[in-house]
UniProtKB/Swiss-Prot annotation:
Brain. The gene is ATP6V1G2. It comes from the Eukaryota. Gene3D superfamilies: 1.20.5.2950. V-ATPase is a heteromultimeric enzyme made up of two complexes: the ATP-hydrolytic V1 complex and the proton translocation V0 complex. The V1 complex consists of three catalytic AB heterodimers that form a heterohexamer, three peripheral stalks each consisting of EG heterodimers, one central rotor including subunits D and F, and the regulatory subunits C and H. The proton translocation complex V0 consists of the proton transport subunit a, a ring of proteolipid subunits c9c'', rotary subunit d, subunits e and f, and the accessory subunits ATP6AP1/Ac45 and ATP6AP2/PRR. One of its GO terms (biological process) is regulation of macroautophagy. It comes from Homo sapiens (Human). Residues 57-69, 78-89 have a biased composition (Polar residues). This is V-type proton ATPase subunit G 2.
Amino acid sequence: MASQSQGIQQLLQAEKRAAEKVADARKRKARRLKQAKEEAQMEVEQYRREREHEFQSKQQAAMGSQGNLSAEVEQATRRQVQGMQSSQQRNRERVLAQLLGMVCDVRPQVHPNYRISA
């Protein structure tokens, strides 16, 4: 009877050690999973920062060149407007004289399609 009781005790102790080993293995697995998850999260975060930085640099390059283009277009527009204004000032008197001459110098003529019926 004592041997049976001793055998049962050994079995219980072995079962307890096995349960402890299984619990330890589960804890190690949980720690490894948690560590892997944290590492993956860090990698994702680093990749996201790299892509964001790349996007910002491309956007800055595009907007920078666009800003230069708008400044160039604005400057060219100002030059054209100034050219038109100076041309208007130079030709104003001549155009007015020509226009008044056409309006005031009336030469009556019979229209070519007019038929004299008599």
